[in-house]
Curated annotation (Swiss-Prot):
Protein's name in the database: 4,4'-diaponeurosporenoate glycosyltransferase
Pathway terms, separated by semicolons: Carotenoid biosynthesis; staphyloxanthin biosynthesis; staphyloxanthin from farnesyl diphosphate: step 4/5
Alphabetical list of CDD domains matching this protein: Glyco_tranf_GTA_type
GO BP: carotenoid biosynthetic process
Highest taxon listed in the record's lineage: Bacteria
Function: Catalyzes the glycosylation of 4,4'-diaponeurosporenoate, i.e. the esterification of glucose at the C1'' position with the carboxyl group of 4,4'-diaponeurosporenic acid, to form glycosyl-4,4'-diaponeurosporenoate. This is a step in the biosynthesis of staphyloxanthin, an orange pigment present in most staphylococci strains.
Classification of source organism: Bacteria, Bacillati, Bacillota, Bacilli, Bacillales
Family designation: Belongs to the glycosyltransferase 2 family. CrtQ subfamily.
GO molecular function: glycosyltransferase activity
Organism the protein comes from: Staphylococcus aureus (strain bovine RF122 / ET3-1)
Compartment(s) of residence: Cell membrane
Length: 375
């Protein structure tokens, strides 16, 4: 069995080499004080039954050092979303249904929101997002100024978990970031065509020139469509990590919501990752199974060194934790038990593939979305 021990060790070593390459290029926001004394930004928040989350976002906006306009696009909420938003001084606008009823959801709400914005600079922020620092909005504006106030800037918030089950989002969050290609030196350096969805910043002129969210009217993951629309007009598209400025809490409704949410996300997300980066990601993930397999076999067969296989497992685990700490705050127990996370990720991936290729639809927040047109 020593030969098997050597093979598994080599596989894990190759896996970790891939892990070192998939996220070795950082894109971090840099703090900057701008001292605006006028409202230089309109924040548009699409909201559908967000009464339990939107208050945290609005409170963090109030704490910002620069004044902003806030528009909450109430997309058919049946709870107290509108009342909560008004209590924080936000302007609440009810989303008007599309004439033919075929365009609905986040992209529809965002597009309507722009018509109510009084500033040229606009940001779209999901209701489950929170600004962690008082200079967060200033930092976003400064970063946008550094790209000449042109194009699209997007941020993937740092994931803060409050319940144990929320940690099962760990691999999905990491894949969301590294799947953008630009965070790896394996990327060929060509123009980025994708954007994160939770936080985006742009200007009205470029927004309307590209079609804005209208370009995403048939898409579930609107960031990809937005990024492609801006790139087609030769406008810059940039992506950044959220920590330590922007965070979110995901799928707090329960484990079922988490499964449905990531099934929806994976249904269209994987196709944007370049083949060589996807190959590196797959090999890195396979290291989780190879490392636990070696450890389990060493406990059964004396020919395999338990100490060696434990070292291999802990080495992979250390890298696994290190990479995930960049994108979120997750349970240490789940991080150590990463094979469980890998198996859950695989389950959702297969489920998403079936819904994409067999059924052509996914359900989210009581609505069905066709995904056949996004492939």
């Amino acid at each position: 069995m020593k030969w098997l021990s050597r093979i598994l060790t080599v596989i894990v070593a190759m896996s970790m080499a891939c892990g070192a390459l998939i996220f070795n290029r950082r894109h971090q926001l840099k703090a900057k004080t701008l001292n605006f004394n006028h409202k230089s930004l309109t924040i548009i928040i699409p909201a559908r039954n967000e009464e339990k989350r939107i208050g945290h976002l609005l409170h963090s906006i109030i704490q910002q050092q620069v004044p902003v306009d806030v528009i909450v696009m109430n997309d058919g909420s049946t709870d107290e979303t509108a009342r909560v938003a008004r209590s924080y001084g936000a302007t609440v606008v009810d989303v008007v249904d599309d004439a033919d009823g075929k365009w609905y959801g986040k992209s529809h709400a965002c597009y309507q929101g722009v018509t109510h914005a009084c500033t040229n600079r606009i940001a779209f922020v999901d209701a489950d997002v929170t600004f962690l620092r008082k200079d967060a909005v200033e930092t976003l504006i400064n970063q946008y100024q550094l790209q000449g106030e042109k194009g699209l800037l997007s941020v993937q918030p740092y994931h803060i978990t409050k319940r144990f089950y929320e940690g099962f989002s760990a691999i999905f969050n990491l894949m969301t970031v590294v799947g953008m290609n630009v965070f790896s030196t394996l990327d060929d350096g060509r123009t980025n065509q994708h954007a994160f969805g939770p936080v985006t910043l742009t200007n009205k002129e470029d927004y309307y020139a590209t079609g804005g969210h209208k370009s995403a009217n048939r898409h579930i993951i609107e960031g990809f469509a937005l990024g492609s629309a801006y790139t087609s007009q030769s406008l810059p598209v940039t992506v950044y990590e959220g920590f330590p400025f922007v965070a979110f809490c995901m799928y707090q409704e329960g484990f079922q919501s988490l499964q449905e949410g990531w099934t929806k996300h994976l249904s269209t997300g994987a196709g944007g990752t370049k083949p060589k980066i996807m190959a590196a990601i797959v090999l890195w993930l396979f290291g989780s199974i190879a490392s636990i397999l070696g450890l389990c076999l060493s406990l059964k067969y004396r020919q395999m060194s338990v100490g060696k296989m434990l070292t291999v497992y802990l080495s992979y685990t250390t890298q696994f934790i290190y990479l995930h700490r960049r994108v979120g705050q997750f349970s240490n127990l789940l991080m150590v038990c990463h094979p469980l996370l890998f198996m859950f990720f695989t389950k959702i991936f297969i489920q998403s593939w079936k819904q994409t290729h067999r059924y052509g639809v996914v359900e989210w927040k009581g609505r069905q979305y066709s995904i056949s047109k996004e492939q």
